[in-house]
Amino acid sequence: MARYLGPKLKLSRREGTDLFLKSGVRAIDSKCKLETAPGQHGARKTRLSEYGVQLREKQKVRRTYGVLEKQFRNYYKDAARTKGNTGENLLTLLETRLDNVVYRMGFGATRAEARQLVSHKSIMVNGSVVNIPSFKVSANDVISIREKSKKQARIIAALEVSSQREKPTWVEVDNTKMEGAFKRLPERSDLSAEINEQLIVELYSK
């Protein structure tokens, strides 16, 4: 399955919420009718079935983190095999992806941009270059920008934008050094309350 390369705002309208696929510190509500689905008949109100609600939630989370369907299903399988709450385990696995951590630290303006930085070998983990976006980051790992990449305009711009918003409590970032520490795994209370991971569990449990 190919990665989606179309308009980012259309995905947010499809899910009815800001998926933070565009850069910037403000939400996109002012320029994007999130309450209206894309397409000619987007204004029509359709009542979703139970399955439809579960599917929409899965698509929302999958698109937020920029993960393909097969990858997402594999994350769910891993989460189900892990001790604890399956839904929370799933979110933790998604949060520990290297591209997501790079985004959370503010080195990339969006997760898509963070993914590019990783793929283009601009990111180091504990002093070694890692170019796999799905690389699993562990507690106390140090993420840094490769020396030759520190002058990239997009990284500097992303750091300027991220300095205007509060960073997650589970990461610690030194903008001057362009490096940060992944202090701990995020707890469920740290993450968005708009995500209903139980719907995803119900979907895959069928």
UniProtKB/Swiss-Prot annotation:
Statement: the UniProt record of this protein carries the keyword RNA-binding: yes
Which GO terms are recorded in the biological process aspect for this UniProt protein?
ribosomal small subunit biogenesis; translation
Q: Does the keyword S-adenosyl-L-methionine apply?
A: no
Q: Which UniProt keywords apply?
A: Ribonucleoprotein, Ribosomal protein, RNA-binding, rRNA-binding
Describe the location of the S4 RNA-binding domain by residue ranges: 96-156
Give the molecular function GO annotations.
rRNA binding; structural constituent of ribosome
* Oligomeric form and interacting partners: Part of the 30S ribosomal subunit. Contacts protein S5. The interaction surface between S4 and S5 is involved in control of translational fidelity.
Which purpose does this protein serve, as stated in its record? One of the primary rRNA binding proteins, it binds directly to 16S rRNA where it nucleates assembly of the body of the 30S subunit. With S5 and S12 plays an important role in translational accuracy.
| Protein name, as recorded | Small ribosomal subunit protein uS4
